[in-house]
Amino acid sequence: HNFDEVERLDIRIGDFVIIEKAGEIIPQVVAVKKDERPRDAKAFGPPEKCPVCGSKTEKDPAGVYVRCVSTSCPAQLKEKLRHFAARDQMDIENLGPALIEQLVDKGLVKDFSDLYRLDIFALLSLERMAQKSAQKVLDAIEKSKSQPLARFLAGLGILHVGQQSAEILAEHFGSLESLKNATEEELTTIEQIGPVLAKSIYEYFHNPQNLK
């Protein structure tokens, strides 16, 4: 995913590369065996369009990631929902990847709030969904409404906002409404919330798509 590294190492399609473990698990490409490079090895760059929705991509100005910029990309929505429902965020049991796939593909869920509008009839319309399983999903969604603000903020997937910064924001503002109304300048005055993070938070809550 790091095209800066691809360019730095001059990695091409068809190359043989040397890999070592970074940390203890993650494989890291450290060098290219250029003496074994095939004649037809081709250079490549970041994708210009999202492979799922076809929208243009942009490089994260504060990092190395290339992202799809569409707010309606189904692949992005699925990943956002998986993150939102994960154990460390809203902890919605029984809302796994397979179910999320169906909910998005059938148009039943288009944003986080749609999860809380699901009913038994919508779930029973899905493949391999029995009454008992559907009720368990609804019960888990209902239970998630009691999660603390910090977990909810961490679950939204705001760029650069992790669990620690979510807890700082929740403690400082106390409510979602107060955070939504905060200015970018106010956010930058909070300890451990720098300008980049403040800008990301402010822009998230001033995007109409995120306020539905």
Predicted regions and their residues:
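Short, structured beta-strand/loop micro-motifs enriched in basic residues and often containing a Trp
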Residues: 1-4
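Accessory alpha-helical DNA-binding modules that contact the DNA backbone or grooves
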Residues: 12, 24-212
